[in-house]
């Protein structure tokens, strides 16, 4: 990141509320099929980021994804069912892929997901997160469902 022109003040940058279809995992009956659907969504997100970066240019610094873009909301599943099928592990492959996208495109990438915690088995949290341009997860805000 470049130094601000005026010390103590941020330079201008572009932010994007990325509009992309959410392919919810509610039709999937198990984690394996839900994971495949999430992987396909991650590929679409990557393609959209590539296009946005080319269109907007290097001033694009912040991209915000749609709400629950990887899974959509639960549609009648119990808490344990949704936790098993759709909630992401904090160190799971979906977060690794999101971190890689932030790094590849040099943006702060913000979004939210359902997230598990090993200290609360069978439950999940609604988690909002931000990855920085180096791929580090720099912010997580969680709340109970």
Language-model features, listed with the residues they occupy:
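Hydrophobic structural segments
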Residues: 1-145
């Amino acid at each position: 990141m470049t130094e601000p022109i005026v010390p103590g003040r941020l330079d201008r940058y572009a932010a994007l509320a990325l509009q992309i279809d959410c392919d919810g995992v509610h039709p999937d009956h198990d984690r394996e099929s839900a994971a495949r659907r999430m992987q396909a969504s991650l590929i679409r997100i990557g393609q959209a980021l590539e296009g946005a970066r080319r269109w907007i240019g290097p001033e694009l610094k912040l991209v915000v994804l749609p709400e629950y873009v990887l899974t959509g909301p639960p549609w009648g599943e119990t808490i344990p069912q949704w936790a098993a099928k759709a909630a992401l592990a904090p160190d799971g492959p979906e977060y690794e892929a999101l971190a890689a996208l932030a790094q590849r495109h040099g943006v702060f990438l913000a979004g939210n997901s359902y997230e598990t915690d090993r200290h609360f088995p069978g439950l999940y949290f609604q988690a909002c997160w931000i990855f920085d341009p180096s791929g580090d997860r720099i912010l997580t805000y969680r709340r109970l469902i």
